[in-house]
Amino acid sequence: MDDFERRRELRRQKREEMRLEAERIAYQRNDDDEEEAARERRRRARQERLRQKQEEESLGQVTDQVEVNAQNSVPDEEAKTTTTNTQVEGDDEAAFLERLARREERRQKRLQEALERQKEFDPTITDASLSLPSRRMQNDTAENETTEKEEKSESRQERYEIEETETVTKSYQKNDWRDAEENKKEDKEKEEEEEEKPKRGSIGENQVEVMVEEKTTESQEETVVMSLKNGQISSEEPKQEEEREQGSDEISHHEKMEEEDKERAEAERARLEAEERERIKAEQDKKIADERARIEAEEKAAAQERERREAEERERMREEEKRAAEERQRIKEEEKRAAEERQRIKEEEKRAAEERQRIKEEEKRAAEERQRARAEEEEKAKVEEQKRNKQLEEKKHAMQETKIKGEKVEQKIEGKWVNEKKAQEDKLQTAVLKKQGEEKGTKVQAKREKLQEDKPTFKKEEIKDEKIKKDKEPKEEVKSFMDRKKGFTEVKSQNGEFMTHKLKHTENTFSRPGGRASVDTKEAEGAPQVEAGKRLEELRRRRGETESEEFEKLKQKQQEAALELEELKKKREERRKVLEEEEQRRKQEEADRKLREEEEKRRLKEEIERRRAEAAEKRQKMPEDGLSDDKKPFKCFTPKGSSLKIEERAEFLNKSVQKSSGVKSTHQAAIVSKIDSRLEQYTSAIEGTKSAKPTKPAASDLPVPAEGVRNIKSMWEKGNVFSSPTAAGTPNKETAGLKVGVSSRINEWLTKTPDGNKSPAPKPSDLRPGDVSSKRNLWEKQSVDKVTSPTKV
């Protein structure tokens, strides 16, 4: 017993270790080397099982040896039989373990298939959800199934979780089976001890037939051994017969107990199967209920999601409209700024035109001023020329007179005196001429500066005028000198400079001192001319530099004005392009918005058409009664029982009533006659029943309670029209009193009884739109389908 307890404790510890290992594995799913770890664990489990098996076999052999040693009187034949039985039992145990392994493999396969079938209905089920008690129960129910030979296959172990579950399950089942077998073995040993059997045989685990045969053989051998040991060998036949009878009774007793065990096992198996079926059925019902609840929750979530999307779409449309309004406002502001910019450019152009006009007027005034100044200068020059000519003539006349007088005096005395006098007169004359030239130059310079201040753009003309004047002045001076000195010749160089006059020998012969005096006089006369030429050149150079600078400034201003104009043109072109792009983008956005609206309308129309088609198909699929039209009882049709013909009639009547409000009275009379013809068609159906009419939803053109219409619409959208009863809507005020005597009133109205409330067909002059609608309501509340179809809701 101590050895048995030790083995059981070892098995319990091993199960605990395997359970802990399985729990640890369940939390280590992210291991990089999962396959290697699983393979190593399986290898260790196989080694552990083999080791336990060898230990059990060795322990069984040791137990047998101890029992044999305890029986000192047993002969060698009994020892041989025991050894042979032990070997046979070991082979049987190996075969039995193999059969159990195959049976367990088949059971695991069936369990896996069942789990896969359950996964098809509920994906949330996993292999790890199978509890240990259910596994043990399935093990007990699967042990009695038919055995088939199949090879072990480890190729199925693809998923890590399935592999670990199978390993742990097999270990648990094998340990449970061993515990059960050991318990049975203990019970059998106790029974044998109670029956006073001296020897306990090694019984094969879970083999009922082999165990019975072995017990019979052992009991017979024990009887023989005991007789040999005590030396009481008797050859009496009655005693042997008693022993045989006792053995047969014992065998029958064992058989009876085995049958009872079998019956109890069958009953237990049947009970377990029934419980399993009940459990599976309950689980299936629970799954179906959960699935239904999940579907309803999903539908509810989908409806909420749809409402949310619609709200988001409405919000988005509002945002887009707001952005479009802001964009339009921005475009208006930009257009306003562009208009202001154009106005500013026009004003600038206007100012530029005024400036050009002012410049032209100033140029014109400057030209007139120059013309006037030129005329004045010409007049002054003429007056001065006349004065100079007169003075020169006077001087010439005086010189001629002096010359004539000097010829008459003696050459030496008179010549000297005349030369001195001439030199003095020449000096005086040159001083006077120099003074006059300086005064003229000062006047001309002042006029030139004044003209330059008035308008610097016309310097070239002034320069030409001054050149002409300067050219005239030296010529006049030279002429005066030539008139006075006939011996000088006028020489002008190509660059406009005046050279000193070369002297010619006169015919009259003077003395030597007289010749030197004439040379000094000529040099004194040429010096002022050279100085005047230098000053003239300096003035010309300065005037040219000033004119070139002013001309460059004017050219630079013109270029700047041209650049500014180009920039303005570029800005205007860019602004125009921006406006065109904005306009193009706005048009594109408008087109996109229209396309989206068209797409939304088309989608809604397709959805409505689809719902109409589905409703029509559902109405057509409904079973029709086999009764004829004459035998059919009157029945209140609701939207779930309406037909296409009645729907078409209701649409026709609605259209006719809508048209009747704007047409002539003759047309109204025709509508009334059509209503009468429709009423006659339903007379037979109305007369066939006496039952009260349940309230109906009103027609689409009549006052309809909003809640009833909303309920009907929601039922048609959800598809519950044919499964759930329709909610009774609030009755109209017009139909409040039409619940009992409606059919009799309609019959009286149709038969044109004189005491009816209203005439069936009044004249067109008496007809009013209210009469038509009220009469229509009378028969429409009792007709087959007076409400709008679900497609109109």
Swiss-Prot record:
Pfam families: Caldesmon. Residues 26-94, 108-407, 434-458, 492-640, 687-706, 721-740, 747-793 are annotated as: Disordered. Residues 653-686 are annotated as: Strong actin-binding. It comes from the Eukaryota. Residues 47-56, 108-122, 146-162, 173-188, 236-407, 435-458, 532-558, 566-633, 765-784 have a biased composition (Basic and acidic residues). One of its GO terms (cellular component) is stress fiber. The modification Phosphoserine is found at residues 129, 643, 656, 724, 759, 789. The N-terminal part seems to be a myosin/calmodulin-binding domain, and the C-terminal a tropomyosin/actin/calmodulin-binding domain. These two domains are separated by a central helical region in the smooth-muscle form. It comes from Homo sapiens (Human). High-molecular-weight caldesmon (isoform 1) is predominantly expressed in smooth muscles, whereas low-molecular-weight caldesmon (isoforms 2, 3, 4 and 5) are widely distributed in non-muscle tissues and cells. Not expressed in skeletal muscle or heart. Its main location: cytoplasm. Residues 564-621, 664-674 are annotated as: Tropomyosin-binding. The gene is CALD1. This is Caldesmon. Keywords: Actin-binding, Calmodulin-binding, Cytoplasm, Cytoskeleton, Isopeptide bond, Muscle protein, Phosphoprotein, Repeat, Ubl conjugation. Residues 26-207 are annotated as: Myosin and calmodulin-binding. Actin- and myosin-binding protein implicated in the regulation of actomyosin interactions in smooth muscle and nonmuscle cells (could act as a bridge between myosin and actin filaments). Stimulates actin binding of tropomyosin which increases the stabilization of actin filament structure. In muscle tissues, inhibits the actomyosin ATPase by binding to F-actin. This inhibition is attenuated by calcium-calmodulin and is potentiated by tropomyosin. Interacts with actin, myosin, two molecules of tropomyosin and with calmodulin. One of its GO terms (molecular function) is actin binding. It is found in: Cytoplasm, Cytoskeleton; Cytoplasm, Myofibril; Cytoplasm, Cytoskeleton, Stress fiber. Signal peptide: none annotated. In non-muscle cells, phosphorylation by CDK1 during mitosis causes caldesmon to dissociate from microfilaments. Phosphorylation reduces caldesmon binding to actin, myosin, and calmodulin as well as its inhibition of actomyosin ATPase activity. Phosphorylation also occurs in both quiescent and dividing smooth muscle cells with similar effects on the interaction with actin and calmodulin and on microfilaments reorganization. CDK1-mediated phosphorylation promotes Schwann cell migration during peripheral nerve regeneration. There is a cross-link at residues 459, 645 (Glycyl lysine isopeptide (Lys-Gly) (interchain with G-Cter in SUMO2)).
